[in-house]
Amino acid sequence: MSGKLVIGNWKMNTRGDSARQLAAALLADGQTNREGVGIAAPAVYLAALAEQLKGGKIALSSQDVSRFAADGAFTGEVSAAMLADVGCRYALVGHSERRQYFREDNAALLAKMRNAIAAGVTPVLCVGETLAQREAGDYLNVVREQLAILSDIADGEYVVAYEPVWAIGTGKVASLEQIAEIHAFIKNWCLQNAGGSAKIRVLYGGSVKAENAEAILATENVDGALVGGASLDADSFRVICQAAGKMI
């Protein structure tokens, strides 16, 4: 495991044509078409993008994975085995938007983590506090509770992404001091408590843009970035990936 990891989370954006055009632009650029770069696309476009990305180096990620492992009567779900079958290398788990809108709890997220690992897909566990929790000084406890499921992972590789909820899509960015503090906390907690991977990557997410990426990625214990809106613009995403590439 070397170099920074940058994953672009497209969220519920793009259509078929625009997804293909964006992927084509990323494939055509050496800064984005390389190891250590991934895109988390909407589920309906994963199969088409997997075909398009063949021969390139960009990793494909899903934005979620089912908590149900076996095939069966789970309408609307996409299993980890299906994601692996289509070519996904990563799967986001527990993004704050899913925690908020779908009330995902630790039990469901642990099942998702285990299913992804069993299928050979690397889960990216998203953690982070709200503004109220930050201002109340409770943010470390919140993140600790979200990380707790890693104690029940017996084996396998995974990634952690710290995304302060108050910085997602708001234009607000945590200070470099805040980022350094929480990333050190996450790594120390994982070293003492987490199972599975002995060396865990911790990404930062939350209004990562072309203009702030280099400073964020240079911060101690930041192993990469989970990029939202900026990943929908090929030029902006290129600058972020270029900044990450300098730090290999």
UniProtKB/Swiss-Prot annotation:
Keywords: Cytoplasm, Gluconeogenesis, Glycolysis, Isomerase
One GO CC annotation: cytosol
Main location: cytoplasm
Catalysed reactions, as listed in the record: D-glyceraldehyde 3-phosphate = dihydroxyacetone phosphate
Ligand binding (substrate): N9, W10, K11, G169, S207, G228, G229
GO molecular function, one term: triose-phosphate isomerase activity
Keyword Cytoplasm attached: yes
Active site: H95 (electrophile), E163 (proton acceptor)
Cited InterPro entries: Aldolase_TIM, TIM_sf, TrioseP_Isoase_bac/euk, Triosephosphate_isomerase, Triosephosphate_isomerase_AS
Subcellular location: Cytoplasm
Pfam families reported for this sequence: TIM
One of the GO biological process terms: glyceraldehyde-3-phosphate biosynthetic process
Segments traversing the membrane: none
EC number: 5.3.1.1
Cross-referenced CDD domains: TIM
PROSITE patterns reported for this sequence: TIM_1, TIM_2
PANTHER family attached to this UniProt entry: TRIOSEPHOSPHATE ISOMERASE
Record's function text: Involved in the gluconeogenesis. Catalyzes stereospecifically the conversion of dihydroxyacetone phosphate (DHAP) to D-glyceraldehyde-3-phosphate (G3P).
Subunit structure of this chain's protein: Homodimer.
HAMAP family found in the cross-reference section: TIM_B
Family named by the database record: Belongs to the triosephosphate isomerase family.
This protein's name: Triosephosphate isomerase
Origin species: Chromobacterium violaceum (strain ATCC 12472 / DSM 30191 / JCM 1249 / CCUG 213 / NBRC 12614 / NCIMB 9131 / NCTC 9757 / MK)
